[in-house]
Amino acid sequence: MKYRKLIILVLSILIILPVSTLDGHHIANADDDSPKKLKYKENSALALNYHRVRKANFLNNFIYFFSSSKEIKNYSVSQSQFESQIKWLKSHDAKFLTLKEFLYYKKKGKFPKRSVWINFDDMDETIYENAYPILKKYKIPATGFIITGHVGEENFHNLDMISKKELKEMYKTGLWEFETHTHDLHNLSKNNKSKLMKASEATIIKDLNKSEKYLTKNFKKSQKTIAYPYGLMNDDKLPVIKKAGLKYGFSLEEKAVTPNSNDYYIPRILISDDAFEHLIKRWDGFHEKD
């Protein structure tokens, strides 16, 4: 009877998963199954973006291997995979940067060799439970892009969001910085268009000002950056983003960052196990001689 219930539960989850959490994430070349390799430029850095870090238990592993959900395959790694990736980066002498350092080197025009900046979008409970302890263990800095109007919310697009108490605990370690993922514009319309890109100028400015106020009140400082929901932005909305006082914007694209990367389209590589194996491990920056 116990196993029968488990099988029914698993089958139910597999049916539900194709209509998954925060549907509509987009990344350039994400649907291309051809062999990949990042173009290498000597003066460059890697911005590694994560969304979910799931527990490596039987149920989650079963779902991962048998589900066709892109949310599961492309937007999550297991806790064991995440730790393995961090250990690989450390063993290959990655220079882990804070967001402040990352932006400083970009503006200065020269990145240290093997520069890596770790960041997370949405900030649901899986980050606190499964990624935070590993980063703390290895003393790796990271940045979390928060949907500030939904902190602590249960069942936000089927996700339990991290609480303010947990965010403050992470911040006090000195390893975490927090930036905006909007206050309440992280949604898709019926035609799969980002709510941020459909909103009026007044709505966007009001939303981003609310988010900035939340960040400065709770975490004292902000680098004035935004990770666009779903990694999507267009040129028509950039004047509004700038008018709201933001200095940098982050997209999702399989490219290394150079000093010449557009400040409002800074590419971050969405990390799955496949992306790490085929993009990050093969990046020439980890194989050049000093």
Curated annotation (Swiss-Prot):
What gene, per UniProt, encodes this protein? icaB
Provide the function of this protein.
Answer: Catalyzes the N-deacetylation of poly-beta-1,6-N-acetyl-D-glucosamine (PNAG, also referred to as PIA), a biofilm adhesin polysaccharide. N-deacetylation is crucial for attachment of the polysaccharide to the bacterial cell surface; it leads to the introduction of positive charges in the otherwise neutral PIA polymer, allowing electrostatic interactions.
| Principal localisation | secreted
Entry's Gene Ontology molecular function annotations: hydrolase activity, acting on carbon-nitrogen (but not peptide) bonds, in linear amides
Ranges for domain NodB homology come to 114-290
What protein is this chain from? Poly-beta-1,6-N-acetyl-D-glucosamine N-deacetylase
Entry's localization field: Secreted, Cell wall
Q: Name one GO cellular component term.
A: extracellular region
Sorted alphabetically, which Gene3D superfamilies does this protein's record hold?
Glycoside hydrolase/deacetylase (3.20.20.370)
Q: Supply the SUPFAM superfamilies for this chain.
A: Glycoside hydrolase/deacetylase (SSF88713)
Highest rank taxon of the organism: Bacteria
Q: What is its EC number?
A: 3.5.1.-
Query: Does the keyword Signal belong to this entry?
Result: yes
Pfam family of the protein (one): Polysacc_deac_1
What does the UniProt keyword field contain? Cell wall, Hydrolase, Secreted, Signal
What family is it from?
Belongs to the polysaccharide deacetylase family.
Give the GO biological process terms.
Answer: carbohydrate metabolic process
Signal peptide, first to last residue: 1-28
